[in-house]
Regions:
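Hydrophobic alpha-helical segments within soluble ligand-binding/sensing domains
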Residues: 174-202, 241-249, 269, 310-328
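Amphipathic helical "hinge" segments at domain boundaries
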Residues: 2, 48-124
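Short, solvent-exposed amphipathic alpha-helices that sit
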Residues: 89-105, 183-186, 209-229, 271, ...
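An alpha-beta-alpha
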Residues: 185-227, 335-350
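Flexible loop/hinge segments that line or gate small-molecule binding clefts
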Residues: 139-183, 267, 293-305
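Flexible loop/turn connectors
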Residues: 248-351
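Short beta-strand elements in bilobed, periplasmic/extracellular small-molecule ligand-binding domains
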Residues: 102-115, 201, 219-244
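N-terminal helix-turn-helix DNA-binding module of bacterial transcription factors
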Residues: 1-65
């Protein structure tokens, strides 16, 4: 007897979430037409049980969908960044997957660093050849005016994270984020359930949209539990110049230390642990600390850091899908997509 095909089987084949596949098959929620069609074709191909759309695809289910191929001479995908992206950055595994996906479509990626002068003067990197560029993907581009300049190029454009968008006109581009709210709130809930009452945030909430969302998730959570004392001991120095020193000086002035900190990312968390150690506080014995990103360092830092894991492979696949469908269908409505994250409990929160 043949093995029954499940929604999870289809999700595994396409490397999509089970929820996305379920939406396509049950015709619920909002999905890009190309994604919905791809899922339904795969379902028919794999012999999934009868459903409303099956007759539409049975005739050509055996045929592989023709991949979209970029025109010759305009096959470069330009990656723009303001920072050197180390192997510790979540983008490392994401870009591996992204490159793999676009290579299947006979495209290549070029990397261009935006210099401080180019950022200030709103100029493209001198190394970028617009005539050969089919689309742009941006990392660490958090200057709103520069982002608007890129939008004005009228090229297919994807921001992986973005400038803070609160009270600003939307960018005319697709945006991809990791899910920033749910697991921050789960981390706060975990702390409260373990008896922590004064919970604070560390990190510059205005650095980027993801940091802003993480801060707002933290704030909503402590207000939900009626534990707002920690709001007065949030450590949020702005700017990137000598950040560890600024963070140390900020917490050194606190008259009362929090029971726990939720941090904007792992590197803020590690700087915070070091600053607390210099001030005579032990993590987790005196104060708990939670990071975000689940970087390579998080698992071998002392103490091993509780963090929120970003699925780089899924982000890479999603980024390729967003940018290539934008190139293929420029008139699509602009999309904002979030990919799942997961709380990983370790020693820095007593686990």
């Amino acid at each position: 007897m043949a093995t029954k095909v499940t929604i999870q089987d289809i999700a595994n084949e396409l490397q999509l979430s089970r929820n996305t596949v379920s939406k396509a098959i049950n015709n619920t929620g909002v999905l890009a037409d190309a994604t919905r069609e791809k899922i339904l074709r795969k379902a028919a191909e794999m012999g999934y049980k009868q459903f409303a759309y099956l007759p539409l695809f049975q005739e050509d289910a055996a045929k592989a969908a023709e991949p979209f191929i970029l025109p010759s001479g305009k096959r470069e995908i330009a990656m723009l960044t303001t920072q050197f992206l180390s192997s510790s950055h979540f983008s490392s595994t994401m870009l591996d997957r992204f490159q793999s996906e676009i290579n299947h479509l006979h495209s290549g990626m070029t990397i261009h660093r935006i210099s401080p002068i180019e950022l200030k003067e709103k100029k493209l990197p001198s190394s970028l050849n617009i005539q050969r560029t089919a689309g742009i993907i941006c990392f660490e581009v958090f200057d709103y005016d520069y982002a608007q300049m890129l939008c004005d190029l009228d090229l297919p454009l994807l921001f992986v994270d973005s400038p803070v968008m609160n009270m600003r006109p939307p960018l005319k581009a697709d945006r991809l984020y990791m899910e920033n709210r749910i697991e921050i709130q789960n981390a706060v809930t975990h702390m409260v359930q373990r008896g922590k009452k004064r919970i604070s945030f560390a990190g510059d909430k205005n650095h980027c949209q993801s940091f802003f969302e993480r801060y707002m998730a933290y704030r909503d959570a402590v207000e939900h539990f009626g534990l707002t004392e920690g709001l007065s001991t949030c450590a949020m120095p702005s700017g990137q110049q000598n950040y560890p020193v600024s963070l140390y000086e900020t917490i050194r002035r606190f008259k009362t230390m929090p029971d726990a900190f939720v941090c904007a990312n792992d590197f803020v968390a590690m700087d915070l642990v070091k600053a607390l150690d210099e001030l005579g506080y032990s993590v987790p014995d005196d104060i708990w600390v939670c990071g975000f990103d689940d970087s390579q360092e998080a698992s071998y830092f002392a103490p091993r850091l509780t963090s929120i894991h970003i699925h780089g492979q899924i982000m890479g696949y999603t980024a390729a899908n967003l940018l290539m469908t934008r190139i293929e269908e420029p008139s699509l409505n602009y999309r904002t997509v979030y990919t799942e994250t997961n709380l990983i409990l370790r020693e820095s929160t007593g686990d």
